[in-house]
Amino acid sequence: MEEMPKNYDPSTNEPAILQKWLDGGYYKRREGVGDCTVTIPPPNVTGKLHMGHATDDSIQDAIIRMARMRGKSTRWVLGTDHAGIATQTKVDKKLKSEGISRLEIGRDKFVDACWDWTHEYGGIIVEQIKRMGCSVDFDNERFTMDEDYAQAVRKVFCDWYHDGLIYRGKRIVNWCPNCTTAISDDEAEYKDEKGHLWHLRYPLTEPVNGQDYIVVATTRPETMLGDTGVAVSPKDPEKAAFVGKTVMLPIVNREIPIFEDWHVDANFGSGFVKVTPAHDPNDYAMGQAHDLPQINIFDEHAVVVEGYGEFTGMNRDECREAVIKWFDEHGLLDHVEELDHSVMHCYRCDSALEPWLSEQWFVAVDKLKGPALDAVNSGKVTFHPARWTQTYTTWMENLKDWCISRQLWWGHRIPVFYCEDCGWEDALTEDTDVCPKCGGHHVHQDENVLDTWFSSQLWTFATQGWPQKPELLEGHHPTTALVTARDIIALWVARMVMSSLYFLDEVPFKDVVIYPTILAKDGSRMSKSKGNGVDPMDLIGMYGADAMRYNLLTLCTNNQDVKFDANIDKKTKKLIDSPRTEQAKSFVTKIWNASRFLLMNMEGYTPGEPVVETPADAWMFSRLAKAVKMVTERIEKYTFGDMARGVQQFFWNEVCDWYVEVTKARLKGEGRLQAQRNLIFVLDTSIRLMHPLMPFVTEEIWDNMPASVLDLDAEGNVDRAEALMIAKWPEPADYAKYVDEDAERAFELCRTVVSAARATRSRYRLSPKAELDVVVRAGAEDIEKLESLRSTIEPLANTASLVMGADVEKPAASIAVVDSGVEVFVVLEGKVDLSAEKARLEKEIAAAQKELAGCEKTLANEGFVAKAAPAVVQKKRDRAAELKEILVALTAQVADFS
């Protein structure tokens, strides 16, 4: 057998393995028994891989790889999203840098430019996903602007339109004056800002209780130009006399009424609230209830429209300053307060959003949200972790009609056509330039495009042939799982459920797996502007894809957010290092080195059944069976963090540190062949279990391994797969026969004794060759088990004498270790200077006591606790707790010498 290279280099090995997989066609859809279908959440076509993508894709690949190895019919659909506003913004910026305006070149040429941009940059993220080792079918990549996908989008719109679920209406929307398009509530980003609350005087048309004016409080004085009323709370008796009266609106001289409305908070400002129905959603509701005029004072760029004198042509910021100045000059600025408040911003360009009354297209959700709620409440769709169910149901219960129109050029154009001659209007699945009603040729299509989420809501079924080839969905829909971020439970997940139930009468997926948000090391969100983001490709270049994937999977706990351990250069914004990913790489190296050692000792090996010949074999096979069950079940239940950490604990701490150590002596004796078979059985099973987590290194090792019992057919002939990724998965049912609780208990006792001896050597810096006198006290049953392992314990612990019994006495001058109900005493007399050791320990105790007293004094200082940063206070508390634990341990050690 050819010897494995001494070192494993991810930078050269991983690309070579990737090419092997691609050349072998192993990523392609495979048919089998049972199905596992996953549709990758489509990243923006012009985007690049970020830590969220890397986490998401690592989870999905683990699911798919295990399913493929279990012989299931697997389909992992890859695709990208056209990302309407994101792509249009980038292309717009590019054209401007070339001195070109999209308005100059027109819609058709601009859309062509978007396609050019998509073709030029669209493949970057797909290549990055490929480099991660994600086993998607790259030959069947989908795009939300593909012709057949566009037909699906169009059919959905037309069906909902004709079913009365899509309508056009005037509503308050979140408007971005920079992108000049509507933005959904769920896409708006709230930012805390320092602002002001201006108190303005509005003159009464006739005095009330001796007052000539009222005072309204507002954070947006510029919108007063569009005020059409003033509201007070019905709970405020002091304002009752003003109800039914009117004020003369300054600047515009518009007489507007004062009325009562339950929307008003009597404790806000003076209790009088200006009402601007065209520029505030609450005011819009009050305006509807009280039949107030809706006056839009801004155009689509948030510039004051004609009819407002000196204010016309001002942008909203200029208008604010001018209005405040006017009120101040006319003695109507009562006073100003500083105010911290939350302001909505566009998620794409960061401009402050403008509540703006405009005509838009909407989906009426009342008929859609009920079935979507039932799907989750009945368990047809299950969230993991379960707490995200509440996020889904709360959003769905409070769902308002969905604004689906966007004032963009790049995207799915709304398929509604209008006849200018006869007023005909209809939604059509095919374009037309002739009116079917009057035969006229003055027909035009709606200028708006659909919200990106409208098209992506169809992702699980439109990517698999619907509606053209619905038979392709058979066995693959509902899909197995959707792995995604919590940020888009409302934007995407809920809408996918609504549309799938409506058009297919089934849910789009059975499980929704929400992974934690990956934060920067300091707990802040990763972002380009902060320069604290980590590029997954930098991690792969530094540590390899396996190390990155494994580290990310260990972070997939039930926590909502997790900090990623990475150090970033503040000047260059480049990755310096990632200690946790470095540790993950060490695990990859351990797997390689342990496998290489075993394969170097396989001379004369032939495949055959594993046989329990020693207590270590029985223990290892039992632990192996439990590892098979643990990995399989935890991938099935989507508890990836527990699974990943459990794999390392098993392979490193149990297989490498103990079983290989105990068994390697047998490789030199008469039992060599059976020891080889047992070791290869354990190694092969372990490598298969770790493959979904770390596919590259496991594939490379497996390629160097001889056949094991797992590769033998019913007649005992070798029938080995071409690649590990299509080899057979270790099924828990096949390993259940190896579970042996007694054998596990016996060997755990052995490990306790040996570990106590080794820990004593380490603590007191004793030579590994120094033989120790060890005394073990335990129950009779455990002593019997330990005696059966005496021949294993003595060489591993390197004992001069080993006394074991239920009633043995604690030797003088010995250190005690208690674990698993067993007391292990290691005699130190003659091995260390007891008096010097005791003096050293007492000195450490005194130092720890002194430091603890200082910590407690500081923490008792109320000024420190109140004024110091919470993190500093907590650090001091943690240190005090740590010192107490140290003192307990040191005191116990001193007692050992007494």
Q: Which functions belong to the PLM regions below?
A:
Residues 1-51, 74, 347, 591:
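Non-catalytic terminal extensions that flank enzyme cores
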Residues 2, 7, 16, 20-24, ...:
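Residue patterns forming the tRNA-binding/recognition surfaces of aminoacyl-tRNA synthetases
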Residues 30-91, 153, 216-219, 223, ...:
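N-terminal catalytic cores of NTP/NDP-binding nucleotidyl/phosphoryl-transfer enzymes
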Residues 48, 54, 79, 160, ...:
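Conserved phosphate/anionic-ligand binding catalytic regions in large, soluble enzymes, centered on
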Residues 60-61, 221-301, 324, 328, ...:
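Catalytic alpha/beta core of large soluble enzyme barrels
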Residues 65-73, 94-104, 127, 131-136, ...:
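Secondary-structure transition/capping motifs at alpha-helix termini
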Residues 120-131, 252, 456-466, 553-554, ...:
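Glycine-rich, acidic and aromatic/proline-enriched surface loops and short helix-turn segments
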Residues 199, 394-454, 458, 502-545, ...:
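Feature 926 captures the class I aminoacyl-tRNA synthetase adenylation module centered on the KMSKS loop
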